[in-house]
Amino acid sequence: MKKYILKAFMLVALGAGMTSCGDTFLETDYYSGIDTEDALTSISKISTALNGTYYNLYHYSFAGNYAINIGDIPTDLSYWNGKTGHFDGIYTFTIVDTDTYLNSIWEYGYKVADNAARIIEAIPALYESATEEEKAELELYLAEAYSLRGYAQLMLTNIFCHQIKVNGTDFSSEPGIVVINTPIPAFEKVSRSTIGQSYEAVLSDFNNAITHFDTAGGDRGQLQYFGKAAVYGLLARTYLYMENWDAAMSNAQNALNAADISTLTYGNDNYKALYNSETSNTESMFALAITASQNWSANSSGTLWSSYNYSPSPKLQALYGENDCRTSIFAWDSKSTPEVPIFKGGKFSHFSSGNPAYATNYIVNAPEMFLIIAEANLYSPNGTINNAQKALLTVAKRNSDITSIGDLPSTKENLMSFIKDERARELFQEGLRLYDLRRWDEMAEVNATQAPNISFVYTNYKISNLVFPIPSAEVNTGYGVAQNENWSSTLPQRN
């Protein structure tokens, strides 16, 4: 595998400060193996390694920007005004296997997975000499390590592999990722698992996380650390992609129960307040520890959706009703024009400071759970139209013109069409649109142009075929990672 050097990062305290860590157990080549077998020999070192793993998760190369925004940028929801050159290759589908963004996502995704695997492997050896209190602490760390690895491998599978299910068609036998069950010995040849095996590994990690949270007596109860609600939410998302409707419904409800959320926020002022700061979103179950004092500045998601010139597409803007509170966070720079729009951040506005670079990424959120329950009810033999409508209404009431089930469609086909649009309206900037379009087998419109008109360079694009390339730097090392065959043929062609 390609030898990316794991820099010795640690997070002294999530949300408090990022500094360099001198522990050499993090100074290893991921995929080149473990330098020593007994490096993680104390609870304090486990804690340090776990914080380092969170740091890699939060990095702008992964969940802090690239791995999230790649789920929105090449879709019908985003608009690039052409004034800067960020993500432009992805947006315009002039994609190459040396793409910087894909390379960074691959690198940091595997940093998270590899470091988490080291922690998971090391913890059992510390149990024998640990006190009961220390065992509970180790169980908590183990739960979070499983959560981190599961999330990283889910993201890597979605980005670098085919969708596991596309409108009922199974692609689980297609090439998946290199699954990191245990740290890989130095210079060992590897191979890609199937997509199905990759998803099995993800589910196993999330289920193990829940088990160890229970054994630990609960989670930390802090938004910037993985906890039970977030993991249930990720299980729901994973099962949704697998079209396991009953499991998707039950885990989405488990997430809402664990977070003690039964309704959402309505009204312009209240909705806008959700995005005041890095901890203001009361609907969120997991967010990154990005703050006004510790952030990625020019490399932040907020910068991408403001001065780096991405904004909601004219198509997306047209989907909102006149009285939809979600448009309360849509604001435009003083230099913005209809033809050259300059957005001010949206969900990354960080209204308390007015600086989008300070904004966090809210990763797992309650509205997604209600929408999962709604969609799953339409397809599960145990679901009902009425239950789908009730779950959907909780989100759809963001538009104050919708007040009751009677304002929603009453047939499966029309209700599903509404859910598709509602996921666009609600989940914009959360990085889920690409996977929605692929799994629904939508004939997509991408590369929006000619604002303020609704116009796209590519239309009628079978986006479910889209597979990004594995970075050539990885493939060319000769450690066994095969390229996605014919990936370039899955890109859209001009009509």
Language-model regions: role of each:
Residues 21-71, 273, 478-495:
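Acidic, glycine-rich segments characteristic of secretory precursors and extracytoplasmic regions
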Residues 48, 225, 243, 249-367, ...:
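Hydrophobic-face positions in mid-chain alpha helices that act as interaction patches
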Residues 199, 245, 383-385:
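TPR-repeat structural position
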Residues 1-31:
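Bacterial Sec-dependent N-terminal signal peptides
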Residues 37, 64-80, 160-177, 215-298, ...:
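Short, surface-exposed recognition loops and adjoining beta-strand edges that mediate ligand/DNA contacts
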Residues 86-160, 193, 210-214, 218, ...:
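Conserved, well-structured interaction surfaces
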